[in-house]
Amino acid sequence: MTRLQAGHATVTLRRGRGSDLDALVALEREIFDSARFAGHLISRPSFRRLLASPSATVIVAAHGGQLSAYMLMLYRSNSKFARMYSIGVAPHARRRGVARTLLGAAEKDAVSRGRSGMRLEVRADDRGAIAFYETSGYRRSGHHPGYYRDRVDALRFEKALAKAPERRS
């Protein structure tokens, strides 16, 4: 669990759990329920499976007992990369460092699982997200024409992750 100061509020980061299911589904709809993201919402059954899956990590940000953001990481057993599948921050919690803190927590989780890098895809028309990842040390590593359901291209980004220093006794 991590606490972070976001303006005048304290936000707590923790692993998602089954009891977060309703809040995660509501948050997903609040953030992504628009024509731009049509068909890309994570469903209730998918969230339920992901919360219980050993090959996924859901990290949530809570303020005042309510979820305000989440990040979903996926892990393949035969890959040295973790995949950031989704990140969502409620409108009222944006521009307070929550996304950057979630990203840092996800990177630590990836390293703890033995991964040496993280990958993600982002809509080519999402300039804010592209700038966020670039300023977080991610570099563009690929281009996927017509990747999204509305035929918008995706840009792939990746970042090498440093292993935590080994402790000497």
Where is each model-derived feature located?
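Acetyl-CoA-dependent GNAT
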Residues: T2-H8, R15-R94, L103-A105, D109, ...
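Conserved hydrophobic beta-strand within the GNAT/NAT acetyltransferase core sheet
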Residues: M84, M118-V122
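Conserved catalytic-core motifs of GNAT/GCN5-like acyltransferases
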Residues: E121, E134, R139-R156
